[in-house]
């Protein structure tokens, strides 16, 4: 799931307004109900961890733009949450949040965006949204992740290699690269 949203300053305010409205429209509920758009977290421990992460982020200077707490109902539900103003010295900057928490970062240019994107211990996937596809390709090449999607968030298919870099793993699953993970190759040399 997308967690860190790095926005150019020219679109940040407009994006945040539309994003916030979309989060307000999320329907929390039973994942078996087709009208539900956000189900529960996997466990009470996951809910407690996420609650502590958000509280700690705010305590360390992040702004709670929306949400930020467990939903008062049976189950392990957490409100769709948006955090802004996270600085590098905030623990949230380097943590992974496993739940509906979006971190918003604002940058002045592509170089800042790439530097911020790469300043992470993780690198499973990323996405670049742009009307300029050549610019997006340059950025995708510079982003340190195992997968980058342009104008799309994520996808999977048997023919697409899946995997990350840094603390998000080594090697690939799926595709011919995934099959090679299960092959032991042997070198045999005959000296003449």
Labelled PLM ranges:
Residues 1-80, 111-146:
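Aldehyde/semialdehyde dehydrogenase
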Residues 27, 70, 77-192:
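Conserved C-terminal structural/oligomerization subdomain of aldehyde/semialdehyde dehydrogenase
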């Amino acid at each position: 799931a997308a967690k860190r949203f790095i926005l150019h300053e020219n679109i940040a305010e407009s994006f945040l307004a539309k994003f916030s409205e979309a989060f307000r429209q999320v329907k929390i509920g039973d994942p078996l109900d087709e009208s539900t758009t956000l189900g529960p977290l996997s466990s009470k421990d996951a809910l407690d961890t996420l609650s502590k992460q958000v509280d700690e982020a705010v305590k360390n200077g992040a702004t709670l733009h929306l949400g930020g707490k467990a939903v008062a109902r049976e189950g392990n539900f957490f409100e769709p949450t948006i955090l802004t103003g996270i600085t590098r010295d905030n623990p949230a900057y380097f943590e992974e949040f496993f739940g509906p928490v979006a971190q918003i970062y604002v940058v002045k240019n592509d170089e800042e965006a790439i530097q911020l994107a790469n300043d992470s211990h993780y690198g499973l996937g990323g996405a670049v949204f742009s009307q300029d596809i050549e610019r997006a390709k340059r950025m995708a090449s510079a982003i340190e992740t195992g997968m980058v999607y342009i104008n799309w968030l994520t996808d999977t298919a048997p023919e697409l290699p899946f995997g990350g870099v840094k603390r998000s793993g080594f090697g690939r699953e799926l595709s011919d690269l995934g099959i090679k993970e299960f092959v032991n190759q042997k070198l045999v040399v005959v000296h003449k």
